[in-house]
Amino acid sequence: MAKNYYDITLALAGICQSARLVQQLAHEGQCDNDALNTVLSGLLQTNPPSTLAVYGGNEQSLKMGLETLQSVLNANRQGPAAELTRYTLSLMVLERKLNANKSAMNTLGDRISQLDRQLAHFDLESETMMSSLAAIYTDVISPLGPRIQVIGSPAILQSTLVQAKIRATLLAGIRSAVLWQQVGGSRLQLMFSRNRLFKQAQSILAHI
C-alpha cells in the first residue's frame, strides 16, 4: 500500500513542534503559546476525522513543526538541531514502548478522558491543567523509560511551572508519535525517505 506522505509529514511535524517547544522552554523559560496550544489541544482529539484535525484543521498551526522537521532532516550531529533530533527520536522510542504496553495505553486513555471535567473550569494552558498533564506524563510515560534528558538553563529548569510545561509538551509529543505510527510512519523513512519528507514539508510550508 502506498504511504500517505502528507499525513506522515503532518504527524512528524507535530512531534517536531513538541521537541522545539521543549527546547524553547528549557533554554528561555517560555515558548510560542499558539504552537503550544496546537499540540496540547491535539491530546484531546481522541477520535479525529483526519490527521490535520488533530492540529486544529489548519496547516499554519504546524508551521514551527514543519520548519523544525526540515532542520531535523538536515541536522548535523552537534548544535541545536542535534538536540531537536534527540528529543524527536526519544519521543518515538517512548511511543513504541507505550504501544507495547496495553495497560499503560488504557491508563493513558482513561486519564486523558478525565481532563474534560477540569477543562470545564480551567483553560488548557492554565497552571492547573499543565500540572495535570505533567502528572499523566510522570505517572504513565516516565515509567516506560528511558527518560528524556532535557538540556537547558539550570536556573530555568528549577521552575516547577517550566518543568510541568515541559512534561505536558512531551506528552503532546507522544500523542503525535502515536498518530505518526497510525498513519504509516516508521523510523526507516527517516533514513531512506528523508528527501521525500523534506519536500513534502517544503510543499506544505509553501502554501501556508
Curated annotation (Swiss-Prot):
Keywords: Cell inner membrane, Cell membrane, Cytoplasm, Membrane
InterPro entries: HflD, HflD-like_sf
Residue ranges crossing the lipid bilayer per the database entry: none
A cellular-component GO term for this protein: cytoplasm
Pfam families the UniProt entry points to: DUF489
Highest taxon of the lineage: Bacteria
Subcellular localization: Cytoplasm; Cell inner membrane
Keyword Cell inner membrane belongs to the record: yes
Topology class, membrane: Peripheral membrane protein
Family: Belongs to the HflD family.
PANTHER family per the UniProt record, alphabetical: HIGH FREQUENCY LYSOGENIZATION PROTEIN HFLD (PTHR38100:SF1)
Protein name: High frequency lysogenization protein HflD homolog
Upper lineage: Bacteria, Pseudomonadati, Pseudomonadota, Gammaproteobacteria, Enterobacterales
Encoding gene per record: hflD
